[in-house]
Amino acid sequence: MAQQKLHSIDPAQSRFGFEIRTRFGMKIEGFFPRFRGELAELPDGHQQVRFRLDATQVEIPGKDRYTSWMRGEDFFDVAQYPVVEFESFPYTAEVVKQGGDITGNLTIRGITHVETLHVVPAECTRPGYDCDVISRGTVLRGRYGMNAWQMALGDRVTFILRGRLQEARRP
């Protein structure tokens, strides 16, 4: 039986961000500076991606008050739920090259729903190595128990992922 091959997502060259709009039209952008992720090449030729975002470190650059809100119990509630996780269902490598959808389980605040990341077509022949794999996925925060601030913040949170893989060392 063939084993899966694992590739680590490169934390130095990758970025996991998000944006949410206020009811007044302002866009708030944040990111997760600490994360772990991997791409698995499955024995049947499909791929699967998994990542864990450290929500305790979520940041809205230059906006300390917004950063505190995002970490607080009304949003990510990092004291109780320090990690945001995504595990895709298996998909073909063509999705990353040509663009398409990657669906999987997203867990925020201990609540899991199936969500979809929309991958843009690659700008190179070795996506993840020679160019970023770029995907976006929009979720409704209310589905994850983040119902506070409805008068000020929209319900849609868009995750923007720009990923690179670590190169295997060559002998």
Stretches found by the model and what they are:
Residues M1-P171:
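Low-complexity, acidic/polar, glycine-enriched regions of mature
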